[in-house]
Amino acid sequence: QTSGRGRRQRQWTSIEGGYAGSWIVAEGVEINPGHLQLSGGLAVLNSLGLEQLTLKWPNDILIDGKKLCGILAEGRNIQQGMRVVLGIGMNLKTAIHDSDFEMAFLDEIYEIEFEEFDRRLHCELASLLEFRDDLPPVRHEEIRNQVLEKMKSLGLPRYNGTIFTDFDLNERGELLLGGEAIDDGEYITWV
């Protein structure tokens, strides 16, 4: 993949030494993009197995508070039903960039070749998301529990000035805070 976009139509660029991939995950099958986005983040974390990585709800992976990876899932209605695409972009190798935010690079803490990361990520995505009649259904509860465990390393969410000591995720991947379902991380900070 050589082009794309981020959330809210933000500019997305592929820097040298980076990884960018897109998958048509569901076509004519019901799957929620929010849940898929979290599953994509979990697949990245599982493919690397590094404790230093943090999953920042809803779609980023961080190293020491700096963005390493972004995940975007988007659904569109098509003639056969719904088509859902998952996109993942990650900074594998240190490179010069002109980003507005601090970026992290995987090679600062771990060396992996592009092909090896790609192979591992495909395996993890397949294990989490493959749809076939002869396989058990997608394990939403198991994925939710793993994502929540990874999110705990960020601290507690602050939303509208309130810090929440208890938070959860629903089956759509929305953050549950005080009985409210939040679908956008733009106004959430972690303390």
Residue ranges and their predicted role:
Residues Q1-Q11:
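Basic, glycine/proline-rich low-complexity segments that contact nucleic acids
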Residues R10-T13, G17-G18, S22-V191:
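Catalytic beta-strand/loop module used to bind and position nucleotide/cofactor moieties
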